[in-house]
Regions:
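A C-terminal cap/extension of S-adenosyl-L-methionine-dependent methyltransferases
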Residues: 90-157
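N-terminal start-of-chain detector that recognizes signal peptides
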Residues: 38-40, 58, 122-128
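Short glycine/proline- and charge-enriched loop/turn segments
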Residues: 50-60, 103-108
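Conserved SAM-binding loop
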Residues: 1-53, 63-80, 151-157
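A SAM-dependent methyltransferase catalytic signature shared across enzymes that methylate proteins
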Residues: 71-91, 124-130
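Extended hydrophobic-aromatic, low-complexity segments
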Residues: 44-48, 86-88, 97-98
Length: 157
């Protein structure tokens, strides 16, 4: 049995995520943590950026991605399977750059630039003692179903 199980960028690839989570439940110790990180698809920034730039749903990627989650759908899925979500966070909403007019989907060079801006944003806050602000920012984004990734930390009820 384990104190913690992590699924980082895994759940969206599984043919039967419910079966997999139920199997994981069998190997968790009491009060163990299940940590999951998935892409936050179909969020408002993503779909608006798609519409503004006339893009296809570039994030739909079969056969690699079989499941698509938002914060709400991930939390509902886990609660249905007997988990209580203790913490929910997101990551930087890269799709925001699309709304700024930077179409990184069409131009890979812009993608690298947007990534560097995101890294600089986080580094500047951390270097200036604002780590708690950054954490609260990402939790607030998760509550709005925004952010590139959604991370949850949960326990069995």
């Amino acid at each position: 049995k384990f104190d913690m199980v992590t699924l980082f960028n895994v759940l969206e690839h599984l043919a039967d995520p419910e079966r997999s989570i139920n199997q994981i439940k069998e190997i968790l110790k009491p009060n163990a943590i299940l940590a999951i990180d998935v892409p936050n698809e179909f969020n408002d920034f993503q779909t608006t950026g798609r519409d503004v730039h006339g893009l296809n749903d570039w994030w739909i990627a079969p056969p690699n991605h079989l499941n698509y989650f938002s914060k709400d759908s991930l939390v509902n899925f886990l609660e249905t399977l007997g988990f209580s979500v203790e913490i929910c966070e997101s990551s930087f909403p890269l799709e925001m750059f699309l709304l700024f007019g930077e179409n990184y989907v069409k131009d890979g060079k812009l993608g690298s630039q947007c990534h560097r801006k995101r890294v600089l944003f986080e580094e500047n806050l951390r270097k200036n003692g604002k780590t708690e602000t950054l954490k609260n920012f990402y939790r607030a984004l998760a509550n709005l179903n925004l952010g590139r990734q959604i991370s949850v930390f949960c326990k069995l009820k």
